[in-house]
Each structure stands twice: as structure tokens, then as C-alpha cells.
Design a protein with these regions (language model features):
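N-terminal leader/linker segments that initiate helical-solenoid repeat arrays
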Residues: 1-32, 41, 49, 227-230
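Structural motif corresponding to the intra-repeat A-B loop/turn of tetratricopeptide repeats
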Residues: 7, 41, 73-74, 116, ...
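Flexible helix-coil transition and linker loops at the boundaries of alpha-helical arrays
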Residues: 18-22, 52-57, 88-102, 131-138, ...
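TPR alpha-solenoid repeat register
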Residues: 30, 62-64, 97, 105, ...
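Residue at a conserved register position within TPR or TPR-like alpha-solenoid repeats
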Residues: 38, 70-71, 113, 151, ...
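Terminal, low-structured helical/coil segments at or just beyond the last alpha-helical repeat
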Residues: 192-230
Length: 230
């Protein structure tokens, strides 16, 4: 029986993986593949047992995935940092992207440091990775936005302004115009701020906003956030 063509939640899919593990208990891929259905169905205890086994057997292959899941699904920021930094210590090549492809794992690590209150460290990490991304002409969809918000939160208003402008050029979002409005307010420019809020509302209604099918991204806003600032 082949796994191709079977749905992750199906009995057939899981049975094939179970049989693979019986044949070779060190087959890390099978543990990882089995874990995905449990994560999506909300059985996090079983997911953790399986993904931990996959990491034990092949840390280079699975640490990045587990670290990303810790960030995205569980808000286990310290655990995510630990996994991503461990992966970085094990390999001599680029540690790669998040499972959903939205972020380089170093950007995710920076966001984790922000979440635990280490904003200056977060800025340094994200600045460094964005510079590398720019050299590859592959800046993430939300990279400039997150960095701009960090600048705003640490009162580096001119840097925030410049970075939000880069986000506009790269991938305009309701969030970007919203935080740009907050920056204009800090710079004493209420007219410009009002214009940005109006633009943010238009973009939000058009659906040009941060989104993820499984969780709310960091720095995401809602329509009421815009309305409350107008």
C-alpha cells in the first residue's frame, strides 16, 4: 500500500505510517508525517509525542518545523527560540523558512524575542535577516511590517516611517497603513495619520490584510482597531 493519494486523517494514511514504523522504528519521516494530522485536529499531546520522536531521530530535519509550530500554534516563544537556535548550531547552511513559507526562521525567532520582551534583540535579529533577504531579493510578505512595528514600539519613529514605506512598496497591507498612521501621530502629523487610517480601512475591506488559516499573526489588526483611531 502506498501513502500517496491518501488523506492525512484517513485510517489508511495512518496505517501505512504505523506499518513503516513497525518495519523501521528509526524512520523519522513517519513520526513527523503522523504528527501533522494530530496537530490539525487539536490532539496536541499526541502531536508532541510524535514530533519529539522525529526530532530525536533527525534533529536537523525536524527542529525547524517543531520550533515554528511552537511559535505559531502554542505561543511557546522560549521553546521556539530553543529549537531554532539549536538547529542553527547543528547546521552550516541556511536554516530555511517556516512551514507555511511566510517567514525565514530567523524572522520567527526575532518575533519570539519580541514576545518575551527583548525588543532590541528582536530588532537586531530581524534587521540582519532582512538584509540577507534583500541580497537574495526574497523579502518576506510581512518582514518590513514587523520591523517597523518594533521601531514604533521602541520610539524609533523615523526608522519606523522608512520601514513602513518599504512595506508599502513590497506588499501593501491594512496593518501597514494603520501602524504608519500611529507613526505619523507620534511625529505630530495628524492630517497624514487620518489619511493613512482611511487607506487602512479601504485595504482591510478589500481583504488586503494579514492572514493565516490556523492562527492570528503577530501585529495583525481588526477593523475596530482602525475605527477606534479615527
Amino acid at each position: 500500500m502506498e501513502i500517496k493519494g491518501h488523506y492525512q486523517f484517513s485510517k489508511e494514511y495512518q496505517t501505512i505510517l504505523d506499518e513503516s514504523i513497525e518495519i523501521d522504528p528509526t524512520f523519522d519521516y513517519a513520526y513527523w508525517a503522523k504528527s501533522i494530522a494530530y496537530l490539525k485536529s487539536g490532539d496536541f499531546v499526541t502531536w508532541k509525542k510524535l514530533i519529539d520522536k522525529a526530532v530525536e531521530l533527525n534533529p536537523k530535519e525536524h527542529l525547524g518545523y517543531r520550533g515554528w509550530c511552537r511559535y505559531q500554534f502554542f505561543r511557546d516563544y522560549k521553546g521556539a527560540i530553543k529549537d531554532i537556535e539549536k538547529l542553527d548550531s547543528l547546521v552550516d547552511y541556511d536554516i530555511g523558512q517556516s512551514q507555511n513559507g511566510t517567514y525565514h526562521l530567523n524572522i520567527a525567532k526575532g518575533l519570539c524575542y519580541k514576545a518575551i520582551g527583548e525588543k532590541e534583540k528582536a530588532i537586531a535579529i530581524i534587521e540582519k535577516q532582512i538584509k540577507l533577504n534583500e541580497e537574495e531579493d526574497f523579502v518576506g510578505a510581512y518582514d518590513y511590517l514587523h520591523l517597523g512595528v518594533l521601531y514604533l514600539e521602541t520610539e524609533k519613529f523615523e526608522k519606523a516611517f522608512e520601514t513602513f514605506k518599504k512595506q508599502s512598496e513590497n506588499n501593501e497591507l491594512a496593518e501597514n497603513q494603520y501602524y504608519l498612521a500611529l507613526t505619523y501621530l507620534q511625529l505630530g502629523k495628524p492630517v497624514e495619520a487620518k489619511s493613512c487610517l482611511e487607506k487602512a480601512k479601504e485595504l482591510y475591506i478589500e481583504g488586503r490584510k494579514m492572514s493565516d488559516p490556523y492562527s492570528n499573526p503577530m501585529d495583525k489588526i481588526y477593523l475596530e482597531d482602525i475605527e477606534n483611531k479615527k
